[in-house]
Structure formats: C-alpha cells, structure tokens
C-alpha cells in the first residue's frame, strides 16, 4: 500500500474510510472513464483523498504504464476501477499487485473477483445502486461499498436517488 505524503489525517477527519484506505480526508475521486488521468488522480491523492482510475479496454502493459506514471506523480492511494463486462483478468492481476484498492462496477457483486483482488493484497470496493446490491457486495466480501444513486450522473445501476434507498 502507498504511503501518503505528510502522513496522518486532518484533525477531525478521521473515519473508518481514511483508516482503511490510508488517506487523510474521506474523499474518493470517482473513477470516471477517460476523465481520470494520472495527473488528476495524483492531485487528489496528494491533496489527501483517495483517487481512482478507470482503465476499461486496456492491456496489461497499458495498466502497468499508467500505474508507472501514477507512481512518478504521487505516493498517495490510487486505486483502479474495472467495468465488469469488459474485465480482463490479466489487467486485474497487474492492478491488484500495484494498487491499494480495486473497484468494480456494472456487474453483480462477485465473490471470485473479490477473492482475486484480496489474493494480490488489494482492498476491494463495489459500486452499487440499491440496498439489495449493497448487501450482496458485503456478502461477497467487499471491503468498501460505494452507494451510487441516480443523482451521481454518468452511468449508474440504480433507478432511484440514493436518499430513497432503505437498507
């Protein structure tokens, strides 16, 4: 796992998320495909947050090159997000061995994918769009559940705003 520059958290900002991920503020950059460049991810990580890269339809060599660039720009926590329908297991292995956090989206929570991430030492999160999907992510062994309602914009799985979801 990466060490965060400056160490510690901001006073009063300690949460289970900051402790688990190793960031200073409980903010995670959404893994917006094409928008989350190594430079943006590094800016978020260097500012104390957790950053995510979306790397769909890439090769293992491209994943490694992107993570090399991230390593050059930050020592902060930068994870990699995968769209389940386009998942390449070799890319997953490269990312899991080099990133503190893997994120999955657009697929039902899958215990095998969670176990694959954990086997390489990564934490695993799953983006969900309903309370039922959140329960499935917990049952699959995810370390983090990212609840996303329709107000998130972009692609989402849920059909309701997050505030209307009941547990």
Question: What is each residue range found by the language model?
Answer:
Residues 7-167:
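Active-site entrance/lid segments in N-terminal catalytic domains of soluble metabolic enzymes
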């Amino acid at each position: 796992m990466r060490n965060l520059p400056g160490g510690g958290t901001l006073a009063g900002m300690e949460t289970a998320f900051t402790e688990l991920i190793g960031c200073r503020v409980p903010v995670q950059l959404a893994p917006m495909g094409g928008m989350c460049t190594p430079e943006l991810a590094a800016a978020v990580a260097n500012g104390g947050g957790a950053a995510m890269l979306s790397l769909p339809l890439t090769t293992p060599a491209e994943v490694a090159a992107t993570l090399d660039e991230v390593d050059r720009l930050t020592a902060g926590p930068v994870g990699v997000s995968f769209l389940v329908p386009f998942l390449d297991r070799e890319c997953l292995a490269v990312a899991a061995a080099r990133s503190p956090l893997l994120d999955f989206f657009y697929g039902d929570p899958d215990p095998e994918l969670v176990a694959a991430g954990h086997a390489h030492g990564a934490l695993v999160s799953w983006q969900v769009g309903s309370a039922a999907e959140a329960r499935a992510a917990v049952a699959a062994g995810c370390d983090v559940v990212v609840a996303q309602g329709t107000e998130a914009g972009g692609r989402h799985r849920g059909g309701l705003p997050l505030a209307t979801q009941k547990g």
